Amino acid sequence: MSQKKSPRFELRSGNVDALLLALNTADLDAVRDDLLSRFESTPDFFSDDVVALDLRRLEGTGALALDRVIDTLATLKARAIGVVARADQRDWAGGFGLPLLDSQSRRGGKDEAPKEKAGKPEATAASGQTDAEAAGNTGKGKDSEGAAVNGKASEIAEIMAAANAASAPRAIPTLLIDKPLRSGQQIYAQGDVVILDLVSYGAEVIAEGNIHIYAPLRGRALAGVKGNPDARIFCTCLEPELISIAGIYRTAEQTLPADVLGKSAQVRLADEKLILEPLRMK
Protein backbone atom coordinates (compact mmCIF):
# COMPACT_ATOMS: atom_id res chain seq x y z
CA MET A 1 0.00 0.00 0.00
CA SER A 2 1.35 3.40 -1.00
CA GLN A 3 2.13 5.76 1.91
CA LYS A 4 2.09 8.82 -0.33
CA LYS A 5 -0.16 11.58 0.94
CA SER A 6 -2.97 12.55 -1.45
CA PRO A 7 -3.86 16.22 -2.01
CA ARG A 8 -7.43 15.16 -2.85
CA PHE A 9 -8.55 13.93 0.57
CA GLU A 10 -7.52 13.84 4.20
CA LEU A 11 -8.34 11.08 6.68
CA ARG A 12 -8.23 12.15 10.29
CA SER A 13 -9.90 11.54 13.63
CA GLY A 14 -12.61 13.89 14.82
CA ASN A 15 -15.80 14.27 16.82
CA VAL A 16 -19.30 14.45 15.37
CA ASP A 17 -22.03 16.13 17.44
CA ALA A 18 -25.21 14.07 17.70
CA LEU A 19 -28.18 13.66 19.98
CA LEU A 20 -28.17 10.47 22.03
CA LEU A 21 -31.63 8.96 22.56
CA ALA A 22 -31.22 6.68 25.58
CA LEU A 23 -34.03 4.11 25.82
CA ASN A 24 -35.15 3.36 29.39
CA THR A 25 -37.77 0.76 28.44
CA ALA A 26 -38.24 -2.04 25.91
CA ASP A 27 -41.85 -0.93 25.35
CA LEU A 28 -41.17 0.78 22.02
CA ASP A 29 -44.84 1.62 21.46
CA ALA A 30 -44.75 3.65 24.68
CA VAL A 31 -41.49 5.28 23.58
CA ARG A 32 -43.10 6.22 20.26
CA ASP A 33 -46.18 7.66 21.98
CA ASP A 34 -44.06 9.68 24.41
CA LEU A 35 -41.87 11.06 21.63
CA LEU A 36 -44.87 12.15 19.59
CA SER A 37 -46.60 13.63 22.63
CA ARG A 38 -43.48 15.51 23.67
CA PHE A 39 -42.31 16.90 20.33
CA GLU A 40 -45.23 17.02 17.86
CA SER A 41 -46.16 20.50 19.13
CA THR A 42 -42.61 21.72 18.37
CA PRO A 43 -42.07 20.51 14.78
CA ASP A 44 -38.67 22.24 14.47
CA PHE A 45 -37.22 20.80 17.67
CA PHE A 46 -34.99 18.32 15.82
CA SER A 47 -34.75 20.19 12.51
CA ASP A 48 -32.85 17.39 10.68
CA ASP A 49 -30.61 16.67 13.67
CA VAL A 50 -28.80 13.34 13.70
CA VAL A 51 -29.66 10.93 16.52
CA ALA A 52 -27.96 7.79 17.82
CA LEU A 53 -30.05 5.19 19.65
CA ASP A 54 -28.49 4.16 22.96
CA LEU A 55 -29.59 0.71 24.17
CA ARG A 56 -27.17 0.28 27.05
CA ARG A 57 -29.74 0.89 29.81
CA LEU A 58 -31.92 -2.01 28.64
CA GLU A 59 -31.40 -5.30 30.49
CA GLY A 60 -32.50 -8.77 29.37
CA THR A 61 -34.83 -7.56 26.64
CA GLY A 62 -33.73 -9.68 23.69
CA ALA A 63 -34.05 -8.37 20.14
CA LEU A 64 -36.22 -5.26 19.66
CA ALA A 65 -37.89 -3.79 16.57
CA LEU A 66 -35.87 -0.59 16.53
CA ASP A 67 -37.37 0.40 13.18
CA ARG A 68 -40.39 1.69 15.15
CA VAL A 69 -38.23 4.25 16.90
CA ILE A 70 -36.32 5.05 13.70
CA ASP A 71 -39.59 5.73 11.84
CA THR A 72 -40.88 7.89 14.70
CA LEU A 73 -37.72 9.98 14.64
CA ALA A 74 -38.13 10.46 10.89
CA THR A 75 -41.68 11.69 11.50
CA LEU A 76 -40.21 14.29 13.88
CA LYS A 77 -37.62 15.39 11.28
CA ALA A 78 -34.71 13.61 12.99
CA ARG A 79 -32.31 11.20 11.28
CA ALA A 80 -31.11 8.08 13.06
CA ILE A 81 -27.44 7.52 12.22
CA GLY A 82 -26.44 4.58 14.37
CA VAL A 83 -26.86 2.43 17.46
CA VAL A 84 -24.80 2.38 20.65
CA ALA A 85 -25.09 -1.04 22.29
CA ARG A 86 -23.45 -3.32 24.82
CA ALA A 87 -21.50 -6.34 23.63
CA ASP A 88 -24.44 -8.70 24.31
CA GLN A 89 -26.79 -6.51 22.21
CA ARG A 90 -24.63 -5.96 19.16
CA ASP A 91 -25.63 -9.14 17.27
CA TRP A 92 -29.23 -7.96 16.80
CA ALA A 93 -28.83 -4.19 17.21
CA GLY A 94 -26.99 -3.86 13.90
CA GLY A 95 -29.80 -5.36 11.83
CA PHE A 96 -31.73 -2.18 11.01
CA GLY A 97 -29.56 -0.58 8.36
CA LEU A 98 -27.68 1.51 10.93
CA PRO A 99 -24.02 1.12 11.91
CA LEU A 100 -23.00 0.11 15.40
CA LEU A 101 -21.23 3.05 16.99
CA ASP A 102 -18.52 2.98 19.61
CA SER A 103 -18.99 5.23 22.62
CA GLN A 104 -16.01 6.74 24.38
CA SER A 105 -16.75 4.68 27.51
CA ARG A 106 -16.78 1.48 25.44
CA ARG A 107 -13.52 2.41 23.77
CA GLY A 108 -12.05 2.72 27.23
CA GLY A 109 -12.95 -0.91 27.92
CA LYS A 110 -16.36 -0.50 29.61
CA ASP A 111 -19.90 -0.94 28.31
CA GLU A 112 -21.31 1.81 30.48
CA ALA A 113 -24.70 3.44 30.10
CA PRO A 114 -24.81 7.25 30.10
CA LYS A 115 -24.72 8.80 33.52
CA GLU A 116 -27.90 10.89 33.06
CA LYS A 117 -30.76 10.20 35.45
CA ALA A 118 -32.40 6.97 34.27
CA GLY A 119 -35.93 8.20 34.82
CA LYS A 120 -35.72 11.02 32.29
CA PRO A 121 -37.20 9.80 28.98
CA GLU A 122 -35.83 12.38 26.61
CA ALA A 123 -33.13 12.92 24.05
CA THR A 124 -29.92 14.17 25.63
CA ALA A 125 -27.19 15.98 23.70
CA ALA A 126 -23.90 14.13 23.41
CA SER A 127 -20.73 14.28 21.41
CA GLY A 128 -20.46 10.94 19.59
CA GLN A 129 -17.79 9.27 17.50
CA THR A 130 -18.39 6.77 14.73
CA ASP A 131 -16.66 3.44 14.20
CA ALA A 132 -14.78 5.00 11.30
CA GLU A 133 -13.44 7.65 13.66
CA ALA A 134 -12.49 4.95 16.16
CA ALA A 135 -10.52 3.32 13.37
CA GLY A 136 -8.96 6.70 12.74
CA ASN A 137 -7.92 6.85 16.39
CA THR A 138 -6.33 3.38 16.13
CA GLY A 139 -4.47 4.40 13.01
CA LYS A 140 -3.35 7.56 14.73
CA GLY A 141 -1.56 5.47 17.35
CA LYS A 142 0.26 3.52 14.64
CA ASP A 143 1.16 6.73 12.81
CA SER A 144 2.59 8.13 16.04
CA GLU A 145 4.90 5.12 16.38
CA GLY A 146 6.18 5.61 12.86
CA ALA A 147 6.50 9.36 13.25
CA ALA A 148 9.65 9.12 15.32
CA VAL A 149 11.26 7.04 12.58
CA ASN A 150 9.92 8.93 9.58
CA GLY A 151 10.13 12.44 11.00
CA LYS A 152 6.37 13.06 10.63
CA ALA A 153 5.61 14.24 14.16
CA SER A 154 4.87 17.76 12.95
CA GLU A 155 2.34 16.45 10.40
CA ILE A 156 0.47 14.54 13.12
CA ALA A 157 0.46 17.61 15.37
CA GLU A 158 -0.96 19.62 12.47
CA ILE A 159 -3.81 17.15 11.98
CA MET A 160 -4.67 17.14 15.68
CA ALA A 161 -4.68 20.93 15.84
CA ALA A 162 -7.02 21.09 12.85
CA ALA A 163 -9.37 18.56 14.44
CA ASN A 164 -9.48 20.51 17.69
CA ALA A 165 -10.15 23.74 15.82
CA ALA A 166 -12.99 22.10 13.89
CA SER A 167 -14.69 20.98 17.09
CA ALA A 168 -14.36 24.35 18.88
CA PRO A 169 -17.74 25.87 19.83
CA ARG A 170 -18.88 28.79 17.70
CA ALA A 171 -20.48 31.93 19.04
CA ILE A 172 -24.11 32.29 17.98
CA PRO A 173 -25.30 35.89 17.63
CA THR A 174 -28.56 37.03 19.21
CA LEU A 175 -31.42 37.36 16.73
CA LEU A 176 -33.14 40.78 16.85
CA ILE A 177 -36.69 41.25 15.54
CA ASP A 178 -38.02 44.83 15.48
CA LYS A 179 -41.27 44.23 13.60
CA PRO A 180 -44.56 42.69 14.77
CA LEU A 181 -45.06 38.97 14.17
CA ARG A 182 -48.40 38.32 12.51
CA SER A 183 -50.55 35.21 12.79
CA GLY A 184 -48.93 32.31 10.94
CA GLN A 185 -45.40 33.75 11.10
CA GLN A 186 -42.64 31.74 12.77
CA ILE A 187 -39.20 32.80 13.99
CA TYR A 188 -36.44 30.29 14.79
CA ALA A 189 -33.24 31.34 16.60
CA GLN A 190 -30.21 29.09 17.13
CA GLY A 191 -29.30 31.19 20.16
CA ASP A 192 -31.22 33.92 22.01
CA VAL A 193 -33.88 36.08 20.37
CA VAL A 194 -34.95 39.63 21.26
CA ILE A 195 -38.31 40.87 19.93
CA LEU A 196 -39.24 44.55 20.17
CA ASP A 197 -42.82 44.35 18.89
CA LEU A 198 -46.06 42.41 19.27
CA VAL A 199 -46.20 38.62 18.91
CA SER A 200 -49.76 38.14 17.67
CA TYR A 201 -52.12 35.22 18.21
CA GLY A 202 -51.08 32.42 15.87
CA ALA A 203 -47.45 33.59 15.64
CA GLU A 204 -44.64 31.41 16.97
CA VAL A 205 -41.21 32.20 18.43
CA ILE A 206 -38.80 29.25 18.77
CA ALA A 207 -35.30 29.57 20.23
CA GLU A 208 -32.55 27.22 21.34
CA GLY A 209 -31.65 29.86 23.94
CA ASN A 210 -33.64 32.55 25.78
CA ILE A 211 -36.58 34.55 24.47
CA HIS A 212 -36.90 38.27 25.32
CA ILE A 213 -40.10 40.02 24.23
CA TYR A 214 -40.45 43.75 24.96
CA ALA A 215 -44.09 43.82 23.88
CA PRO A 216 -47.21 41.69 24.36
CA LEU A 217 -46.80 37.95 23.83
CA ARG A 218 -50.10 36.59 22.55
CA GLY A 219 -48.80 33.75 20.40
CA ARG A 220 -46.51 30.82 21.18
CA ALA A 221 -43.02 31.04 22.72
CA LEU A 222 -40.78 27.97 22.93
CA ALA A 223 -37.34 28.44 24.51
CA GLY A 224 -34.52 25.92 24.98
CA VAL A 225 -35.93 23.70 22.23
CA LYS A 226 -32.73 21.67 22.01
CA GLY A 227 -33.25 20.55 25.59
CA ASN A 228 -31.64 23.46 27.49
CA PRO A 229 -33.42 23.54 30.90
CA ASP A 230 -31.71 26.82 31.84
CA ALA A 231 -33.37 28.79 29.04
CA ARG A 232 -35.96 31.40 30.05
CA ILE A 233 -38.74 33.50 28.56
CA PHE A 234 -38.93 37.19 29.48
CA CYS A 235 -41.92 39.29 28.50
CA THR A 236 -43.38 42.70 29.33
CA CYS A 237 -46.98 41.55 28.75
CA LEU A 238 -47.64 37.83 29.16
CA GLU A 239 -50.82 36.67 27.38
CA PRO A 240 -49.58 33.56 25.53
CA GLU A 241 -51.31 30.80 23.62
CA LEU A 242 -48.49 28.49 24.67
CA ILE A 243 -45.19 28.74 26.52
CA SER A 244 -42.56 26.02 26.60
CA ILE A 245 -39.04 25.48 27.93
CA ALA A 246 -37.04 22.38 26.93
CA GLY A 247 -40.25 20.64 25.85
CA ILE A 248 -42.19 21.30 29.08
CA TYR A 249 -45.18 23.39 28.05
CA ARG A 250 -48.31 25.16 29.28
CA THR A 251 -51.24 26.28 27.14
CA ALA A 252 -53.82 29.04 27.42
CA GLU A 253 -56.31 26.43 28.63
CA GLN A 254 -54.62 26.76 32.02
CA THR A 255 -55.41 30.25 33.28
CA LEU A 256 -52.26 32.14 34.22
CA PRO A 257 -51.85 33.46 37.78
CA ALA A 258 -53.17 37.00 38.25
CA ASP A 259 -49.75 38.36 39.20
CA VAL A 260 -48.32 37.53 35.74
CA LEU A 261 -51.30 37.59 33.35
CA GLY A 262 -50.92 40.63 31.10
CA LYS A 263 -47.93 41.81 33.11
CA SER A 264 -44.13 41.75 32.98
CA ALA A 265 -43.05 38.22 33.80
CA GLN A 266 -40.45 35.55 33.33
CA VAL A 267 -40.89 31.84 32.74
CA ARG A 268 -38.28 29.35 33.90
CA LEU A 269 -37.94 25.63 34.55
CA ALA A 270 -37.43 24.05 37.97
CA ASP A 271 -37.65 20.30 38.61
CA GLU A 272 -39.29 19.86 35.19
CA LYS A 273 -42.08 22.30 36.10
CA LEU A 274 -42.70 25.71 34.57
CA ILE A 275 -42.39 28.57 37.05
CA LEU A 276 -44.15 31.82 36.12
CA GLU A 277 -43.23 34.83 38.23
CA PRO A 278 -43.41 38.63 38.01
CA LEU A 279 -40.41 40.30 36.43
CA ARG A 280 -39.11 42.62 39.10
CA MET A 281 -37.14 45.59 37.82
CA LYS A 282 -34.47 46.81 40.23
Swiss-Prot record:
Interacts with MinD and FtsZ. This is Probable septum site-determining protein MinC. Coiled coil: none annotated. The keyword Transmembrane does not apply. Residues 103-147 are annotated as: Disordered. NCBIfam families: minC (TIGR01222). InterPro entries: CAP/MinC_C, MinC, MinC_C_sf, MinC_N, Septum_form_inhib_MinC_C. Pfam families: MinC_C, MinC_N. The gene is minC. It comes from Cupriavidus metallidurans (strain ATCC 43123 / DSM 2839 / NBRC 102507 / CH34). The keyword S-adenosyl-L-methionine does not apply. Cell division inhibitor that blocks the formation of polar Z ring septums. Rapidly oscillates between the poles of the cell to destabilize FtsZ filaments that have formed before they mature into polar Z rings. Prevents FtsZ polymerization. Belongs to the MinC family. Residues 104-120 have a biased composition (Basic and acidic residues).
